[in-house]
Each structure stands twice: as structure tokens, then as C-alpha cells.
């Protein structure tokens, strides 16, 4: 954590380099070192999944991840539904999930956070995935943001329920014409803010 005794911006009269012009002045070194350690080295991660995930009707099911874009002090755990933290602090959690529904009836889906295997109160979000229209599956994207405190060794998971058992978490492959990148079924980002 911050040590206010050596992270204050040095006074204007303190030169950036020593008198010989060879080394950074100690006050400035402390400032930049602590700035890096506090702001640049904070834990973060961007995780996603490129498969199709299904669940049995009304059965809480863990959402899994098989890839990451970048991480710092966070990782995909075992099982692959766990996002594990190596440092402590208040973290912002954002997830985006792409649901599709191939059935002839609308389907309600619920998603919530679990921390260390325990459901986090008041984190469930609901969305209705529309029914198939013609030959096109119904689809909807759910995006949610939370703040939660984590410590070293803590982990988070996303759980979901599909009421009818019809909805899926679906990855859409890349396309050449029209050109567009692939769209992962689920994307989760975590960033420590304090």
C-alpha cells in the first residue's frame, strides 16, 4: 500500500538527477518507483471463452474461460471457471455474455457472482433471450459491472441458470464477407482500482 512518507511529489527545488547528472535523485526515484508499484502494477485481467456453453434447465452452472488477452496478478484457475487473484484490493468486474436461443419460446437467464465458492448477495442479473424468429436464433447480450474486494488466493466465478434449458452462451466465428472478428461468448475483465 502507499507509504505517504515517500510517495509525495518532491519539491520543485529537488533536481531530478544528482549533481553529477548520472543518477536519479533519491526523492524522485522513490516517487516514480512507488507510482509504478501502486498504479502501473495493479492487478488486472481480460478473460474470454471461445466455445458454446450450455446448461440444464434451472441448474446453476459455472461459466468457464479458455483464453485471456492480458493479465497481471490474475489468472484462470482450476477448474477453468475460477479467476484467481494474487493481490488484494477493491476490484471492478465487468462481464459481457452473448446468449442465443434456438427454441420457439422466450427463455429467461440469470447470471451472478460467486466469491470463493459463495454466492455474492444482490449480484444476480436477469435477461430474457428472445425466441427463434424464422431461421435465426434469438439473441441478446448481457453486460454487467460490479465492485468487489479480493485478496491473494481469492477467486471469482460467474454462474448462470437458463429457466427453460434452451439458451446457450454462444461464440460467433469471424467472418470474411462482411469482414468482422470473432465474438467470444463471454468476456470478463477485472481491474483493481484501490
Model-inferred region functions:
Residues 8-12:
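Long, low-complexity or tandemly repetitive, helically biased scaffold regions used
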Residues 2-5, 18-194:
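Extracellular jelly-roll beta-sandwich "head" domains, especially the C-terminal globular C1q domain
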Amino acid at each position: 500500500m502507499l507509504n505517504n512518507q515517500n510517495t509525495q511529489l518532491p519539491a520543485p527545488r529537488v533536481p531530478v538527477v544528482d549533481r553529477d547528472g548520472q543518477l536519479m535523485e533519491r526523492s524522485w526515484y522513490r516517487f516514480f518507483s512507488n507510482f509504478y508499484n501502486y498504479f502501473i502494477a495493479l492487478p488486472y485481467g481480460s478473460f474470454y471463452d471461445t466455445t458454446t456453453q450450455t446448461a440444464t434447465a434451472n441448474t446453476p452452472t459455472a461459466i468457464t474461460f479458455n483464453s485471456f488477452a492480458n493479465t497481471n496478478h490474475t489468472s484462470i484457475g482450476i477448474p477453468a471457471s475460477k479467476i484467481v487473484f494474487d493481490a488484494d484490493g477493491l476490484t471492478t468486474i465487468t462481464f459481457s455474455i452473448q446468449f442465443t436461443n434456438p427454441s420457439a419460446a422466450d427463455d429467461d437467464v440469470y447470471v451472478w457472482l460467486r466469491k470463493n465458492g459463495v454466492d455474492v448477495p444482490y449480484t444476480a442479473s436477469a435477461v430474457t433471450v428472445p425466441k427463434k424468429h424464422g431461421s435465426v436464433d434469438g439473441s441478446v447480450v448481457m453486460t454487467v459491472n460490479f465492485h468487489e474486494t479480493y485478496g491473494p488466493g481469492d477467486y471469482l466465478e460467474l454462474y448462470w441458470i437458463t429457466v427453460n434449458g434452451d439458451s446457450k452462451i454462444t461464440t460467433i466465428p469471424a467472418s470474411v464477407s462482411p469482414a468482422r472478428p470473432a465474438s467470444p461468448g463471454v468476456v470478463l475483465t477485472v481491474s483493481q482500482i484501490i
